[in-house]
């Protein structure tokens, strides 16, 4: 029996769980108030606070850290790497502590896991961080050599659901072609070809369909005009793209349940905006089907919005079901995804990857691509 501790720090919470093989023994979501987090100037300053919570969770459950077989966390904002399970190493910790790719609470998970590993000798892993990059070079070309398309998406849930579909069909993930749409506060739509995400919208930086809180792809000239209008600061413009865009901008809420309630009460404007979001999601699914040359085994809808089966899921399904059968996997169980990934490594079913080596290889390939684009 393998005992696994999962560590999943989010912006306003820390989710911790204990698994014994596939069975979840305990899970707890610790919410953090603005007052609690407000005393920390930087994300990294929260490290001791979050680590203490994890230690207390383990102690109160009656286990010692040395009784675990593995510690596993979300990957933070690392350098781009292919998908998979990675052994936490010194370069990874250095990258996360530097914040060179951005500061996010998810950066803390691997650092905490590494501390526990250093104390006990138990291995620490991260799984499919948001920076997973398996894009083909043709997908990186943006339309101008000074700008490159980036792969930033919900890699953990996307890969987990894709592998679950393959398992259901008695196939390997590496044998299937899928279009997977993760629909939550951010929306990522990816083309999975034979085990690799060869194209995906950048779910964070203003690319793809609009979402409950993000604007998605916008008309560029209008955006440039607004940037130089003198009416908004740099930070205000960024907030319009991520945070105050999408449903928030149109309807004043990011809660799909509230939007559905308004639609049922006869709010035609809410219905029009919500239908437009479904339209854009469907359009991006069509784009990814084209990336796969129409050879799509299944279209998969997942994430929190996939629970909304009165309007959103039917509207999307009606537009894309001609491409391939549509499967719906509501929500995203990141804790289970982390634990099962670590379990595959512990059982010898999957080899952990080396972050230092894989990030170096990715950089060499990317530099070669840039040489071709910029020459």
UniProtKB/Swiss-Prot annotation:
Transmembrane segments: none annotated. It catalyses: butanoate + ATP = butanoyl phosphate + ADP. Keywords: ATP-binding, Cytoplasm, Kinase, Nucleotide-binding, Transferase. GO terms for molecular function: acetate kinase activity; ATP binding; butyrate kinase activity. It is found in: Cytoplasm. Its EC number is 2.7.2.7. GO terms for biological process: acetate metabolic process. Pfam families: Acetate_kinase. GO terms for cellular component: cytoplasm. Its main location: cytoplasm. Belongs to the acetokinase family. PANTHER family: ACETATE KINASE, BUTYRATE KINASE 2-RELATED. This is Probable butyrate kinase 2.
